[in-house]
Each structure stands twice: as C-alpha cells, then as structure tokens.
C-alpha cells in the first residue's frame, strides 16, 4: 500500500483535549497540577497522549508563561576535566544535584574555565536559562561575577569569593581547620615544613604553569580566599609555637593535574632538603606527593609526614592525615538556600563543621 504523501499531524494539547472531550485546562492540569484530577482521569489522559504521540507541554512555552526556567546554574571557573576528576568537587555537585532534584529543578553547568575567551564565557552566563546561580570557588577578581550579577537573579557563593555584597555564602573555617592540623604537625616535632598549595591567582606565576616556589607577595595577597586562609592557618600555628612563618616553604601548583602534587613536592625538597613534613591544601596534592615520594624511596611516615585537606574517600582509604570537610553537605545547603532564601532578605553566611583526621601518614621527624 502506498504511503500517504501527508505525514500524520503531531498531536497537540488542543487535539488531545478534543479527543478526550475535556478542556485544555484539564489536560494541562494532568501534567502541571496532578492533584487537581482523579487518578483515573490522569491515567486516561496519559494513555491517550501516548497513543496519539503527544509529548507533553512545550517546556519553552511553559518557561515563557511562568517566567521560570526550572533549573539552577552552577558556575564553574575550573576546566571541566578537572572539576569532574576532583573528588571534593564531585561530592559538592552530587549534593547540589540532590537538592535541585528535591526542589523539582534541573542543574545546568555554566563553564567559564581558563580555556574560554571572556566573550565565550560571558555569553554562557548571559544565555543560561536558569532561575538562579550557585558560584563554586571563584577568585575574588573573577571577570564573570559582574556579568552574572547583571542577570539580577538569586545567587549563592560556595567557599569563595568572600564578602560579595548581598550574597549568601556556604563555607568552612579554612583558617581554623588548617591551624588545628598544623598544630598537630608541630606537636609531632616538625620544624622544617613545606606547604603545597593549589593556585593562588588566575595568572601563571612567573609566566609558567609548572609548580614553583611562591614569592611572598603572591602568598600574602592571593585572589583565592580559600588558599589564603589555609596558608595563614599554618602561619598562625607557627607563630603560636614561636617559629618564624617566613621559614615555611610554600610551593604553588597552578595546574590541577594528577601529577601536580608530586611535581610540587619535588620543588619543595629542592628548595629545602631539610623538610620533614609536607602539608597540602588539598588531598589530591597530598596523594600525588605520596606517590612521588615512594618512587624516590622516601617512605611515609617513616621519612616524611604528609597531610592533606578535604577528606575525600580515596584519601581516607589510604589513611591520609587530613581535614575532613562536608563537601556534599555544602552542595545540599547551597541548593536549599537558593530555593529557600531567607525571609529577611539579608545574606546568610553558613559555616559548616570540619574534623581533623589523624591518619597513618603522620609521625615524628626521622
């Protein structure tokens, strides 16, 4: 039998209503307000929709009608390959996604990493179909924050930047947590300490992305608040112990690669071969440093103490001495705060608890 030259017309809300002899409002309620209809009527509508090929209300039309996009935008300033390989970041995203799902919202990644031009990143921020933004760990001089604020949408910052006027923030006491960990390292008897940090600014130090000794000016005024606070936590502990904080060997790892911690550890030991403890501002740096030390025949903790920060699963499994922070809870809280803003209209600063985990990678100096 020859096919009809005219394909069947796509079912619409109106044609489905006519088929079932009900109003368009009834069809709309089946999808948008199911509590308004009986279970039998909803089932009859969905069965007919499936038979006729009706896909449901047009999401674009619904968005225009309600002025709601039904999604939260997550602005990520790191390369996506890093964001999806960093366990702490993954836990945060999982918590945020869980919160969005509970609120009936989707989650849209707005990637504005260093590999994009400013124009590309700005277009992504301005074109994102979202009802609000969560900003995850951006520098205080991030160029996209002013662009995002042009949208005049609800916003929550996680970790950094600090003190964005009128914006709520979810964070931990990075300085206090790192000080507590450093006090423990000092109690063990360590005096020659290396500190391996994540990047301190958006620009390359010395025009080179490889790990390098951080100069005092860059250490004292980094644009990443979290790294600054963790560095100063170690300084606080050293000062309280009567030590000169300037004796701390600080190495910045600009690139976030699987081998970055090992490369940074090598630089630290070249600068100060007397180092007996390597403290790291992230577990991923510490785990990489441990692998590198082992390849050189430097055993942990027999020859070297190594500590991290985050408390990711792999670090805890390997017995890393670290600070455990609630990364997944950060995501949940950020989503909840965005979906349920304070009635006062004033920003909320929510500081979550941390825990120092004394693992198997710390001991007295050899």
Curated annotation (Swiss-Prot):
GO terms for molecular function: alanine racemase activity; DNA-binding transcription factor activity; transcription cis-regulatory region binding. Residues 11-66 form the HTH lacI-type domain. Keywords: DNA-binding, Repressor, Transcription, Transcription regulation. Residues 13-32 bind DNA. InterPro entries: HTH_LacI, LacI/GalR-like_sensor, Lambda_DNA-bd_dom_sf, Peripla_BP_I. Disulfide bonds: none annotated. Disruption phenotype: Deletion mutant has better growth ability in a cholesterol-supplemented medium compared to the wild type. Deletion of the gene alters the composition of the cell wall, leading to its remodeling. It enhances the hydrophobicity and permeability of the cell wall and resistance to ethambutol. Deletion of the gene also inhibits the host innate immune response to M.smegmatis, and promotes the survival of M.smegmatis in macrophages and infected mouse lungs, leading to reduced transcription of TNF-alpha and interleukin-6 (IL-6). The keyword Repeat does not apply. Transcriptional regulator that negatively regulates transcription of the mce4 operon, which is involved in cholesterol transport and utilization. Acts by binding to the promoter region of the mce4 operon. This is HTH-type transcriptional regulator MSMEG_6044/MSMEI_5883. It comes from Mycolicibacterium smegmatis (strain ATCC 700084 / mc(2)155) (Mycobacterium smegmatis).
């Amino acid at each position: 039998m020859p096919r009809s030259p005219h394909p069947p017309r796509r079912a619409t809300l109106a044609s489905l209503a006519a088929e079932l002899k009900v109003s368009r409002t009834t069809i709309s309620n089946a999808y948008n307000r199911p509590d308004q209809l009986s279970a039998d009527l909803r089932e009859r509508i969905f069965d007919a929709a499936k038979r006729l090929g009706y896909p449901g209300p047009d999401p674009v039309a619904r968005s225009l009608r309600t002025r709601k996009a039904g999604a939260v935008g997550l602005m990520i300033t790191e390369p996506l390959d890093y964001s999806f390989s960093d366990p702490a970041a993954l836990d945060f995203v999982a918590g945020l996604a869980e919160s969005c799902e509970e609120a009936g919202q989707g989650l849209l990644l707005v990637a504005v990493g260093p590999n994009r031009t400013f124009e590309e990143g700005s277009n992504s921020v301005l074109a994102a179909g979202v009802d609000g933004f969560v900003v995850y760990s951006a520098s205080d001089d991030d160029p996209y924050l002013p662009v995002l604020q042009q949208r005049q949408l609800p916003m929550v910052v996680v970790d950094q930047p600090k003190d964005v006027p009128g914006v709520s923030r979810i964070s931990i006491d990075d300085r206090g947590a790192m000080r507590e960990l450093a006090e423990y390292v000092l109690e063990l008897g360590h005096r020659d300490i290396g500190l391996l940090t994540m990047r301190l600014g958006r620009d390359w130090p010395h025009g080179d992305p490889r790990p390098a000794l951080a100069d005092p000016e860059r250490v004292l005024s980094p644009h990443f608040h979290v790294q600054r606070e963790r560095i100063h936590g170690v300084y606080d502990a050293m000062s309280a112990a009567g030590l000169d904080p300037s004796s701390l060997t600080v190495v910045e790892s600009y690139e976030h690669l699987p081998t970055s911690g090992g490369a940074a550890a090598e630089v630290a030991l070249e600068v100060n071969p007397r180092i007996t403890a390597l403290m790291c501002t992230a577990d991923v740096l510490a785990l990489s440093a441990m692998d590198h030390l082992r390849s050189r025949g430097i055993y942990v903790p027999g020859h070297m103490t190594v500590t991290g920060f985050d408390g990711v699963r792999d670090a805890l499994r390997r017995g890393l001495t670290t600070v455990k922070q609630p990364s997944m809870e950060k995501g949940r809280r950020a989503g909840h705060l965005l979906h349920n803003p304070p009635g006062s209209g004033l920003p909320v600063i929510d500081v979550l608890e941390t825990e120092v985990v004394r693992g198997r990678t710390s001991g007295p100096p050899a």
